[in-house]
Amino acid sequence: MDRIRIVGGNKLNGTIPISGAKNAALPLMIAALLTDETLILENVPRLADVALLQRILGNHGVDIMSAGKRPGDREHQGQTLHISAANIIDTTAPYDLVSKMRASFWVIGPLLARMKEANVSLPGGCAIGTRPVDLLIMALEKLGAEIVIDGGYAVARAPQGLHGAEIEFPKVTVSGTHVALMAATLAKGTTVITNAACEPEIADVADCLNKMGAKITGAGTSRIVIEGVEKLHGARHAVLPDRIEAGTYAMAVAMTGGDVQLQGARPELMQAALDVLIEAGATITQTNEGIRVQRNGSGIRPVDVSTSPFPGFPTDLQAQLMALMTRAEGSSRITETIFENRFMHVQELARFGARIALDGETATIEGRPKLRGAPVMATDLRASVSLVIAALAAEGETMVNRIYHLDRGFERLEDKLSACGATIERISG
């Protein structure tokens, strides 16, 4: 199993190209199921989750061709995928694939809309009554689907096709919004989604769907209106830059000090995170190429932050911010309001000497002037990269184990950091 070795203490200086957003690329790939023509997606990141979704779509009979730079090439370029779902041969998404990635459950919407049926395994680890898929299923039922849970599968049918509906989510749900949006494009009549998630990735998916012939307005706001159409066609679309990746590297620069250009990053996608970084002592400048992040001389200032849906501070940057605050000059508080049990990185950060106390969904971090390198273990995607950020500033050597989590969401992380002066390497085996 691969590991990452880091020797801390180097400032980061240079340019980091920002990859396409995983959280847009996955639903965009799934949207290809809505048409029998070819969807061409540019700037798709080379990630383990993208490769897994290719396998899942292939199981349905989808043909995918890839072009672009190969892993290991020094020059960054996202791959281009040509996705053709002309011949869907199977509407079942089996447990052995869906259990590996929750977002793969989203195929239920496009399959139901186009094929009028879908049998999709429930994602692993979903307790009855607290499943994130409950709101998603509710939305599809509003659109006229008949869905029963049988043997761990959502068995969905819409013999007469889907119809427009008023869908009001009781709480903001990214997955529910994505699936309702995709399914409603082929429904008869008008669908109105209220209390919709406002994430930029949802607006990006809607933009692509409109290029395919959908009639969607309001995506990126809490009220989305979809006029159903009879058929969607092929299109070409470039995945928007990954605001979470950009925010992660920005926090790494704030942690180590230095001066880095985040090439392709868009400040309007991540203003809440940039505001927090400025409060913490970083200098942020918008440039023609993206965003420039600097911290030279001044210390890291403590901040108090609560996660919230877009445009608030994203939960996917919470662990990275906590790593940064371990070296702040004072006490910080971070409250997690989106997900339960998202403080699994606390125990591993403590191995560096971090002082973090938990009280329910709030973490209090007492900043320390120095961290020390240690062997640590990644527990999930965002937690794993927080350990890398801590290691970059720690004295001595750190070995990060179970880095397959990193490969799910960060393209060539060690190459990008190494190019900016970090002492970091992947150790295979």
From Swiss-Prot:
EC number in record: 2.5.1.7
Gene3D superfamilies: Enolpyruvate transferase domain
CDD domains named in the record: UdpNAET
Residues that coordinate or bind UDP-N-acetyl-alpha-D-glucosamine: R102, R131, P132, V133, D134, L135, D316, I338
Top-rank taxon, per record: Bacteria
UniProt pathway: Cell wall biogenesis; peptidoglycan biosynthesis
Compartments it resides in: Cytoplasm
UniProt binding sites for phosphoenolpyruvate: K22, N23
Broad class of the protein's primary localization: cytoplasm
Broad enzyme group: transferase
A matching Pfam family: EPSP_synthase
UniProt family annotation: Belongs to the EPSP synthase family. MurA subfamily.
Name recorded for this polypeptide: UDP-N-acetylglucosamine 1-carboxyvinyltransferase
Source organism per UniProt: Afipia carboxidovorans (strain ATCC 49405 / DSM 1227 / KCTC 32145 / OM5) (Oligotropha carboxidovorans)
The gene coding this protein: murA
